[in-house]
Design a protein with these regions (language model features):
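A substrate-engagement module of RecA-like helicase motors
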Residues: 1-15
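Conserved helicase motor core of SF1/SF2 NTP-dependent helicases
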Residues: 11, 17, 25-313
Length: 313
């Protein structure tokens, strides 16, 4: 009897709802019964695999809107076999490849114009326009920006990368220490709070190392010096934004190997999360072995954005 009453309540809510929100796979849950949805809108559609995108579509969809960016990260696929079978490709990307007409939103309201400058030219064919001006995105205090009119910087660090205990991920102690110092100074200036800063890195071992560093060096819990600070992987920041992003690249080796950091979509995500300031931390000699990273570093050097003075001494 309790289950019947509960289902009646759920049915009442669903029957009165004009919009039902769920994940793609969640739209197939039995709680929705046989309900049909003639209009389906899938947000972050480029991160959904084709099978998961089909789940809401088969519920009577007559009008489908896919919203996403195929120049950013694709669906996360752990299995190599699944990736080889095509599960790493989204329905969004397939339809674009088939020539389906698209509508691009060309005005961005997140980034300081200088942060937008490189990804706009490199990844979006110069089509992006700014819906905010420089005065609305003042450079944060607490960091010595090489050019205060352009709150973008690359901080060179020499220390080598290392494998974690399981040998499955990579970390870099020197880059972690420099990143810690940058965040500490940004917060000390009083212009930002912990939740305004995002620390981004491509490797889970570096996420763990830096989380421990911030926890032990001031505390991430409520009342701690770094409360509100988020340390996440690049994949964990897609679709999100912060006032300042500090991107710790990790890779540093004499062979010039950068692994999946060479994925231009991963770089695009990392450098487009920041509103007021973007700080990159890394080993330029290693990163320069990759064409996409070489392009970004050349751009930064040409504009005088290399922060050689940070993290020294």
């Amino acid at each position: 009897e309790m289950q019947r009453l509960e289902q009646q309540m759920v049915d009442g809510v669903l029957d009165d709802a004009e919009v039902v929100c769920s994940t793609t796979v969640g739209s197939g849950h039995r709680i929705l019964g046989a309900r049909r949805f003639p209009i389906v809108l899938v947000d972050e559609a480029t991160q959904a695999s084709e099978p998961s995108s089909l789940v809401p579509i088969v519920r009577g969809c007559r009008h489908l809107v896919l919203v996403g960016d195929h120049r950013q990260l694709p669906p996360t696929v752990i299995s190599d076999r699944a990736a080889e079978g095509g599960l790493g490709r989204s329905l969004f990307e397939r339809l674009i490849d088939l020539g389906l007409p698209t509508h691009m939103l060309t005005t961005q309201y997140r980034m300081h114009p200088s942060i937008r400058e490189y990804p706009g030219a490199r990844f979006y064919d110069g089509l992006l326009e700014d819906g905010c001006d420089r005065a609305e995105r003042p450079p944060p205090a607490g960091f010595l920006w090489p050019d205060w009119d352009r709150p973008v910087a690359f901080v060179p660090v020499d220390g080598e990368e290392e494998l974690d205990a399981e040998g499955a991920s990579k970390a870099n102690r020197d880059q972690a220490a420099v990143t810690f110092g940058i965040v500490r100074e940004l917060l000390a200036a009083g212009d930002l709070e912990g939740q305004d800063i995002g620390v981004v890195t491509p490797y889970t071992a570096q996420v763990r190392m830096m989380t421990d560093l911030f926890d032990e060096g001031g505390g991430l819990d409520e009342g701690g010096q770094f409360h509100g600070l988020e340390v996440r992987s690049v994949d964990g920041y897609q679709g999100r934004e912060k006032e300042v992003i500090v991107f710790c690249t990790v890779r540093s080796n004499p062979r010039g190997e950068i692994g999946f950091l060479s994925d231009r979509r991963r770089l695009n995500v990392a450098i487009t999360r920041a509103r007021r300031g973007l700080v990159m931390v890394g080993h330029p000699q290693t990163l320069r072995r990759d064409g996409t990273w070489r392009g970004w570093l050349d751009w930064a050097e040409e504009l005088g954005l290399m922060a050689w003075h940070v993290g020294r001494g």
